Regions:
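Conserved nucleotide-sugar phosphate-binding/catalytic loop shared by glycosyltransferases and other
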Residues: 2
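Terminal accessory/targeting
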Residues: 5-6, 10-52, 57-186
Length: 186
């Protein structure tokens, strides 16, 4: 499930601080529950058993998690910054850090493609990747979730704030007007 209407109504970046826009983060749990229940009912109507939630713009908060538990059977979130699946707040979390398929030395990774913005070449690369690496894919029911302990929490917070710091520096650098004095002798 990828949200309900994909309309960003909040500027809250949620748990992972990826984007300053959200369909869910920052909204009251009652509104989040309504949206998630409406989305779940569409899948139920089509007899589709949804197992994973992918928050639009990677922005979800703790109320989103509570609403998911309350109105859906979903117990897996595709998001997060750790290199392995982990258990947190009653959900299995699958790391989602990649916008295109690439090999990794270790870990379990998901990658996402947005059909409306991907080129034909990007889809051909994905097809080739799947053909070449199909034996490395793991079914959901075979994943092993690691505990979310203090060490994982620190690692995740470090990765979140490291990215926030880089984005802040980038915004200063790109927003700054650089004055370079040039000596000119008439």
């Amino acid at each position: 499930m990828h949200g309900f209407d994909h309309v960003y109504v909040s500027k809250d970046s949620g748990i992972f601080k990826f984007n300053k826009r959200s369909e869910f983060a920052g909204l009251p749990i009652s509104i989040q529950s309504q949206k998630l229940a409406a989305s779940a009912s569409m899948f139920d109507r089509e007899s589709i058993n949804v197992k994973i939630f992918v928050a639009p713009a990677h922005s979800l908060d703790h109320s989103t998690l509570q609403a998911l538990k309350k109105v859906t059977r979903i117990r897996i979130i595709s998001d997060g910054l750790l290199p392995f699946p982990y258990k947190r707040e009653g959900f299995g979390w699958l790391p989602n850090q990649l916008n295109e398929a690439e090999t990794k030395d270790k870990g379990v990774w998901t990658f996402n493609y947005h059909p409306e913005t991907c080129s034909d070449e990007a889809f051909m690369q994905l097809k080739r990747f799947i053909e070449n690496h199909h034996t490395e894919f793991t079914p959901l029911n075979k994943l092993r979730y690691h505990p979310y302990r203090f060490e994982q929490m620190l690692t995740e917070k470090y990765l979140i704030y490291k990215r926030c710091f880089y984005e802040y520096i980038k915004s200063i650098w790109h927003g700054a007007k650089i004055y370079v004095p040039v000596y000119h002798k008439p």
